[in-house]
């Protein structure tokens, strides 16, 4: 069933973001804003290393540092890189953790998905608020 006149990748982003937001109890506007901001593609193509040696994977640009926590469940880079809703679920799981456990307002906590470094968090936070409005 077609959804309005959106391209397939955008339909995936909207449907998967809202489904993951409900599943992990993350505000849908925050999940949609992060999905729009990240805007990655399926696959392992982003091998740009961060200063800590990690890199981002897939549609939600899921950082490899979090794979250490997911290893015990058998979750691999290849799993995160697949098209479909799985990467959105993993992102919502992470965002939920930030909202529950981090300090600050909800926007700062949500921006921790990108970075906890204040200067990077602030820029990302400002853009999230704009996108979520």
Give the residues covered by each predicted segment.
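Catalytic glycan-binding domains that act on GlcNAc-containing polysaccharides
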Residues: 2-133
């Amino acid at each position: 069933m077609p959804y309005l006149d959106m391209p397939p990748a955008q339909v995936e982003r909207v449907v998967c973001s809202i489904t993951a937001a409900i599943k992990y109890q993350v505000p849908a506007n925050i999940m949609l804003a992060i999905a729009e901001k990240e805007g990655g593609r399926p696959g392992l193509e982003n091998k740009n290393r961060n200063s800590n040696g990690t890199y981002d994977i897939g549609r939600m640009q899921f950082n490899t540092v979090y794979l250490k926590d997911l290893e015990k469940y058998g979750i691999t880079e290849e799993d995160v890189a697949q098209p479909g809703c799985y990467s959105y679920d993993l992102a919502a799981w992470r965002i939920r953790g930030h909202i529950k456990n981090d300090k600050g307002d909800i926007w700062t906590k949500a921006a921790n998905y990108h970075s906890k470094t204040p200067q990077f968090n602030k820029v990302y936070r400002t853009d999230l608020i704009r996108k979520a409005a």
